[in-house]
């Protein structure tokens, strides 16, 4: 009597109850007839190296899985339970599968280090050799004449303007938000720039103004969610920047330009117009005061 050759497919059929139990544990159902058809015909015709007798090779299983999970009309969602169960048997094999697992691949040998090339012999010269200076490296960002950013390594930052005398005493008004306070100061003193500037300590402990660097803006934008996704997180970030950097009006515009889309900036502008303080410190309804502080154009 001839001997029967055991293959991965025949092995799964001999242990079909365990195969169905494995599929059930993953929340799917498999049928024996379709299991055989997929293994002996459908997956073979995918031309990814799947053998008719089946295999527990993860490489072959992964190739078939890519075809099955392909988006659109090229995918085969009805075959997902079957390839998922095949992969489960290969990655977490029961005792009857282990003898049929392919041998592990040998580790890739490390490349041999290249032998150093002999250096060219030094030639005699009557004159000393003067090393050539390294060519200047191109800037990371192209220069923009209209940009307020400065090269922090080559330019001396402008000195911080001197302080003013104490404000005259008067009746106290309700405190406004940091943004509105700065905008109100700008409206009341149009001939002067805001004195709340991004500060750093310079020579002789003298405060100096430093505008936002390109890396600051890039890091804030790349490490925080968009305003449309998480407005609270981005609002907290901007409020912390206002406290720690004390930016000018132009700095605020640059910050909003980097962190918000055009539509988001328009929404922020419309909301800010509702909070423009009047002479009593409360939101005003006077159109001329609102337009002077927050023009729409």
From Swiss-Prot:
Residues carrying the lipid (N-myristoyl glycine) are 2
**Residues annotated as region Disordered?**
97-207, 276-297
- Signal sequence interval, chain numbering: none
Which InterPro entries does the UniProt entry name for this protein? G_retro_matrix, G_retro_matrix_sf, Gag_p12, Gag_P30, Retrov_capsid_N, Retroviral_Gag-Pol_poly, Retrovr_matrix
Q: Any extra detail in the entry?
A: This protein is synthesized as a Gag-Fes polyprotein.
Q: Which GO terms describe its cellular component?
A: host cell plasma membrane; membrane; viral capsid
Is the Lipoprotein keyword given for this protein? Answer: yes
The entry lists its GO molecular-function terms as: RNA binding; structural constituent of virion
Q: Name one GO biological process term.
A: viral budding via host ESCRT complex
The site (Cleavage) lies at 127-128, 197-198
Show where the record puts the motif LYPX(n)L motif: 126-130
Asked whether the keyword Membrane is assigned, the reply is yes
Motif PPXY motif is found at 157-160
Output the lineage of the source organism: Viruses, Riboviria, Pararnavirae, Artverviricota, Revtraviricetes
Q: What is this protein called?
A: Gag polyprotein
Q: Where is this motif: PTAP/PSAP motif?
A: 118-121
Q: In what ranges is there compositional bias, type Low complexity? A: 120-129
> Keywords of this protein's UniProt record, alphabetized?
Capsid protein, Host cell membrane, Host membrane, Host-virus interaction, Lipoprotein, Membrane, Myristate, RNA-binding, Viral budding, Viral budding via the host ESCRT complexes, Viral matrix protein, Viral release from host cell, Virion
UniProt feature, compositional bias: Pro residues: 100-119, 130-146, 156-171
């Amino acid at each position: 009597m001839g001997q029967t050759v055991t293959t991965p497919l025949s092995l799964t059929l001999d242990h079909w109850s365990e195969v169905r139990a494995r599929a059930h544990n993953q929340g799917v159902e498999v049928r024996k007839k379709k299991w055989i058809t997929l293994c002996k015909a459908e997956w073979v015709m995918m031309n990814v190296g799947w053998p008719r007798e089946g295999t527990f090779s993860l490489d072959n299983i992964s190739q078939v899985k890519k075809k099955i999970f392909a988006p659109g009309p090229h995918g085969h969602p009805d075959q997902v339970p079957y390839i998922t169960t095949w992969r489960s048997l290969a990655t977490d094999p029961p005792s009857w599968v282990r003898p049929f697992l392919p041998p592990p691949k040998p580790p890739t040998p490390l490349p041999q280090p290249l032998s150093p090339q002999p250096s060219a012999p030094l030639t005699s010269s009557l004159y000393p050799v003067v090393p050539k200076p390294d060519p200047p490296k191109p800037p990371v960002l192209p220069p923009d004449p209209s940009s307020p950013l400065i090269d922090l390594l080559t330019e001396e930052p402008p000195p911080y303007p001197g302080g003013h005398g104490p404000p005259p005493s008067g009746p106290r008004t309700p405190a406004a938000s940091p943004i509105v306070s700065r905008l109100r100061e700008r409206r009341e003193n149009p001939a002067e720039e805001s004195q709340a500037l991004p500060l750093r300590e310079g020579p002789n402990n003298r405060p100096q103004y430093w505008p936002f660097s390109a890396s600051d803006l890039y890091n804030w934008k790349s490490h925080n969610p968009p305003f449309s996704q998480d407005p609270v997180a981005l609002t907290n970030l901007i409020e912390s920047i206002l406290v720690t950097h004390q930016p000018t009006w132009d700095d605020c515009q640059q910050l909003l330009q980097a962190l918000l889309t055009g539509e988001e900036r328009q929404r922020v502008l419309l909301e800010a117009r509702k909070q423009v303080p009047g002479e009593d410190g409360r939101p005003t309804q006077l159109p001329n005061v609102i337009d002077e502080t927050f023009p729409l154009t």
